[in-house]
Amino acid sequence: LDRPFSTLSGGEQTRALLAGLFLDEGAYPMIDEPTNHLDGPGRALVSEYLRNLGRGFLLVSHDRAFLDGCVDHILALNHTGPELVRGTFSSWFRDKEDRDRGELARNEKLKGEIRRLEQAAKRTSGWSDKAEKTKHATRNSGLRPDRGFIGHKSAKMMQRAKNIERRQQSAIQEKAGLLKDIERADSLKLTPLACHSGRLLEARGLAAAYPGAEGRPVGFTLNQGERLCLDGGNGSGKTSLLRLILGEDIPHTGTLFRASGLEISYVPQKADHLQGKPVDWAEKLDIGLTKFLTILRKLDFSRELFSRNMAEYSAGQRKKILLAASLCQSAHLYLWDEPLNYIDLFSRMQIEELLLQYRPTLLFVEHDRVFQERIATQVVRL
């Protein structure tokens, strides 16, 4: 309690801010992403507090388990517009998936009908052109056609064809207007490197040391293709352990084995240091610009953002810059420190599917319980 606020960990700062918010019992709580940096027990505590608050509140969060524990309404800001429904996050998402499946099926049917109408319109246009050509009879036939009769007949045929074509185009536009803009996330790709050694890391009694204190010693082995979650309370030294693995000179006890020639891709917890445009960051890290920008587009970046200074980005956009850069790197080991802080729901799901599909060797810190349960092949608790 005597330490300056700036020296606290991200989760400890979040706890202090929430405590200050809840002290004012007369105010209407408006809470913006309270789970960022907050550990598992802290999230459970805040969720329970809100559930039993006895009055209304407005909450922004992308943590699925947290939302299920404390809300009874969902206001979803979808691409097609806002949607307010009664229920938990899980009930809303199940209904959304059911609706999306139905809309996808209807979209495919409509696209088939549009293709058939376009083909029919093309044939009709051909008839119209053919009718126009009959006005100009060939001179090689040896006959002298009645141009007045043929002109009248072809004009009627052409007018009929044009009317049919207009009706077909109107039907095409009507069908196209029925197509639904369904919220879908593009799949991401990753190219992890295979390590010559099956064992990438091994820690024995490893703990970061602090002035007057020492973290809890941990032991683990991380093999090729495994995904290890470091779990622990705020301030327990998880980030310090990641920095040790990166090779930083941090006072510690115990031993750490790292496979020789280990290539590591690192996503730090904070992204406040980002400056310049995305192209500048790509050049600094020596990663392919086209691939980098493509990944950002798949993570819902607009092209307009590429010309802006990253210092002007939201916290979630800056975090996506770090994640996209990591996904551009081929590495033996991916080291991610709270990668989901400030990240929206659909991007979280994209990242989960990516990790399950490409199975990189990953050591991560993340308090999102759903992400932990889906991704971690082992959990080490501090």
Language model: regions and residue ranges:
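Coupling and communication elements adjacent to P-loop NTPase active sites across diverse families
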Residues: 1-11, 95-211
